[in-house]
């Protein structure tokens, strides 16, 4: 696919590439989950760091991964439909594809415990039973999941004693342990810690923050977007309406989640409600980003610069984990000690440019990225022709 030809797949590739870049920038200012503020920074630089931190998390925190999840469901639909028109059922092959993704995810988790691939691999199985349901049923299931049912159960359970004191979320203990080996551990200790302590911590954090309900819901919405063909060129009116609606939904939820102390309720009921409101706020703003990107893509050709990264998203995601942790963790360059958000953002931009140029060079000689090629070939092992949809 040409990165300058504004076809349907190009906008998906470009949007996926945009998500990869924004994820990289967030990971850099977080030092790849090793959040640390260097000492001795001048006041003016601390002020700039705070603006950068707050701005990037406002724009991308909880949204970039959601774009990725939406497009994961979209990609499933494309692959499923391509096999369906041949009279084949893709679901068993997709299950095998998810097993392979879990392998890539565990490899990536060794370097970076915040890996999302392994979680996508497990939750992706939710797409298999809904693949043949009507769009109305799929939408209903997605809405129920987006409502965060477990958080509502917690809220109801807390109503008799709303002022009960709550301890720290369980995930915090795991992250505290991780900070020690991020700073002082050898590479081997970090890698083992990420696969054990870190992985448990991330799963607990994902549960505490409603991600384990939100992710499959976004997969299903992405599948529905594929069915409706909303990413095809010519859907300007749909996306304009979607942008306005999402913005109107986002504003009150963002205000609520930003000032929870104004709610005037006890901590036991505030925590689950904050999980719900934050989840809804992030999804709404994710839709704002997707809508805006679509509307700009067909009028601003330069946005296609993200397409090469989108076509190599698996490779790009894993490589950024390997390189980034080597830059910031103690076993590598230990840059966590010296870089606030400003300098870490600069490092992230440089890495994104390098990854983009590498992707352009690689795709000039190959049809897919290196890890994408391995994933594709293993997906279709024993499946005959290799001429299958590669999006």
Where would I find each of the regions flagged by the language model?
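Functional transmembrane helices that form membrane-embedded active or gating regions
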Residues: 7-15, 19-20, 242-246, 297-323, ...
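N-terminal signal-anchor module of multipass membrane proteins
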Residues: 1-72
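Long hydrophobic alpha-helical segments that form multi-pass transmembrane helix bundles
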Residues: 143-221
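Alpha-helical transmembrane segments of multi-pass integral membrane proteins
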Residues: 220, 265-364
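Solvent-exposed interhelical
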Residues: 88-89, 126-144, 224-245
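Juxtamembrane membrane-water interface segments that cap and precede transmembrane helices
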Residues: 44-58, 187-203, 265-272
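Membrane-proximal soluble regions of multi-pass membrane proteins
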Residues: 51, 364-391
